[in-house]
Amino acid sequence: MSFLSCEEMLAAARSQNISLAEAILRSDLAESRLTEEASRHAMHHLWHVMEATSRDYDPVQRSRSGLSGGDAAKVEQAHQAGKSYGGDYLAEVTTEALKTAECNACMKRIVAAPTAGSCGVLPAVLLPLSRAGEADEEAICDALYVAAGFGQVIAARATLAGAEGGCQAEVGAASAMAAAALCHLKGGTPEQCAAAAAMALGNLLGLVCDPVAGLVEVPCIKRNVVGAVNAVSCANMALAGVDYAIPCDEVIDAMGRVGSLLSPDLRETGQGGLAATPTGVRIAERLAEEA
């Protein structure tokens, strides 16, 4: 995918009178020299892995550190007992985000979308729609192309690495990708997809990367839920015609600049934020002693 800006993606779709997913697919084919069949096969494979990760979730399994595991099952049980807000879809989004992120912490196979630390966001918003029959696999894969297109632009203009840009570059980027994907899935225009992505990333601007004990567990797993729910809200706003004052490319550029301004302590080093709290330090010391 050779797009270096969201505006370039939108222009390609407009000029050829094709969907945003098709414009991104064509760009990918031109760059990768794959056939359309091969490219789509690869995207379907990624989707199948996302589905498998959810199926493979074990509610009794805990991560090696003991910091994570079992929370997705708690949320699911609470919703079934009528002890949650937001309806079935929001409960499933929360559950799926936790499932995938917990599987990552337990060393299971996930799709880095765009990173392992933010792996729960994109599947969380799509899996419930697939299971409910609201989107078939072909439509889901088109949405994944849209997500990938925005992810590529973020990578090109800023960064996807928490070590470089903080959690805004990981969960923030994943949230933007998911918002655009959801918008496309409901028939949103390319411009609405870009607005959804801009809102989602803008809402998480400045989010730091402060993993306790340097592990992708606390607070990373719960932030996947925030990224997913944020994506849903932003997609809803964009589909309603709500615009964002700052163009998507400028939001991405701002994220890159904010990331460069963050202290190294807040960029995946485990030296600041929650990692530097008394409890965070005690956890790190305990795990070091047990190693």
For the regions a language model picked out, list residue spans one by one:
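Conserved phosphate/anionic-ligand binding catalytic regions in large, soluble enzymes, centered on
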Residues: 107-125, 169-174
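Active-site-adjacent structural elements in folded domains
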Residues: 107-110, 160-166, 218
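Alpha-helical support elements that line or immediately flank enzyme active sites
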Residues: 123-134, 179-187
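Glycine- and small hydrophobic-enriched segments that form the cores of compact globular domains
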Residues: 85, 114-119, 131, 135-142, ...
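Glycine- and acidic-residue-rich phosphate-binding/metal-coordinating active-site segment common to enzymes
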Residues: 144, 150-163, 167-177, 182
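Acidic-glycine-rich active-site phosphate/pyrophosphate-binding loop
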Residues: 87-104, 139-158, 203-211, 246-249, ...
